């Protein structure tokens, strides 16, 4: 009888959950009968020799690796800060925040039952499941948020940044994941929801940055995510600073074209 590779990892106690198994597999350290395998859905015989070589993922999901890159490249420090993880899902970003010194994290998601058990039981985490960030008011959050990560799907960041801004303290920071497939017009999205055109990637980056600037977010940095989205989409990390003095910004992202080129060179191999 054959099983999916991610299921095999969980059954053999090589991963705590299917989500974590997928992350470990995608990190390129899983071998089946001596051959490296990086697709969680690949089917193998139950008797196959499955090995995890090297260090397993240090976060509850691969999302943590995205925020880790942003923190490293953007010089973000979270020690002692009150944070929010919008689109928390399993909690990879939340986990990364806590491991980097956050004292409190509001984990917000429209779904429910997804946040990893270890995070649910962490007194520093406020689990806000079944919650749409668009309708959260400052009165519901007793703290002013100092750092926000945003990783949402099936909605444009232009619908989310405004509500997030209302919850933040002056000079607070945001790292948002720009997903071209949810920002571009339908006519620009290819088969299986994948956007491959560099020009479209650049267009959506500039659109999101421009919108953010129009509501008082200053764009500080841009990088590409180290991991593709589930369908193979290249995604981008945009670093913003919250300004509350009425300023607006054009947010011409310097070097965006070069970052898009580098993303394709690195991830489309």
Regions found by a protein language model. Give the residues of each.
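Short, glycine-/aromatic-enriched active-site segment of Class I SAM-dependent methyltransferases
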Residues: 180-196
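A basic, amphipathic helix-loop patch mediating RNA/tRNA/ribosome contacts
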Residues: 1-48, 82-83
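Flexible, glycine-/basic-rich loop-and-beta segments that form/coincide
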Residues: 234-269
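Conserved class I S-adenosyl-L-methionine
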Residues: 79-89
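S-adenosyl-L-methionine
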Residues: 106-159
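A short glycine-rich, Lys/Arg-flanked "PGG" loop and its adjoining helix->strand segment in the class I
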Residues: 158-175
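Glycine-rich helix-loop-beta junction characteristic of Rossmann-like nucleotide cofactor-binding loops
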Residues: 14, 72-79, 139-142
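Conserved SAM-binding loop of SAM-dependent methyltransferases across substrates and taxa
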Residues: 90-101
């Amino acid at each position: 009888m054959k099983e999916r590779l991610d299921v095999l990892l969980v059954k053999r106690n090589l991963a705590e959950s299917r989500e974590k198994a997928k992350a470990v597999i995608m990190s390129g350290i899983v071998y089946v009968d001596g051959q490296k395998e990086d697709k969680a859905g690949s089917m193998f015989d139950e008797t196959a020799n499955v090995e995890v070589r090297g260090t397993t993922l240090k976060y509850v999901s691969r999302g943590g690796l995205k925020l880790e890159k942003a923190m490293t490249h953007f010089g973000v420090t979270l020690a002692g800060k009150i944070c929010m993880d919008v689109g928390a899902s399993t909690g990879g970003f939340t986990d990364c925040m806590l491991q980097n010194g956050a004292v409190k994290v509001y984990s917000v998601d429209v779904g429910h039952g997804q946040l990893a058990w270890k995070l649910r039981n962490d007194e520093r985490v406020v689990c806000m499941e079944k919650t749409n960030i668009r309708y959260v008011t400052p009165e519901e959050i007793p703290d002013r948020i100092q750092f926000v990560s945003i990783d949402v799907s099936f909605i444009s960041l232009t619908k989310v940044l405004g509500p997030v801004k209302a919850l933040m303290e002056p000079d607070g920071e945001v790292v948002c994941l720009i997903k071209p497939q949810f920002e571009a017009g339908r006519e620009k999205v290819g088969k299986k929801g994948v956007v491959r055109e560099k020009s479209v990637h650049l267009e959506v980056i500039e659109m999101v940055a421009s919108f953010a600037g129009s509501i008082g977010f200053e764009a500080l940095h841009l990088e590409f995510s180290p991991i593709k989205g589930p369908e193979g989409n290249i995604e981008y990390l945009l670093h913003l600073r919250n300004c509350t003095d009425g300023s607006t910004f054009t947010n011409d992202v310097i070097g965006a074209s070069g970052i898009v080129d580098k993303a394709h060179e690195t991830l489309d191999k």
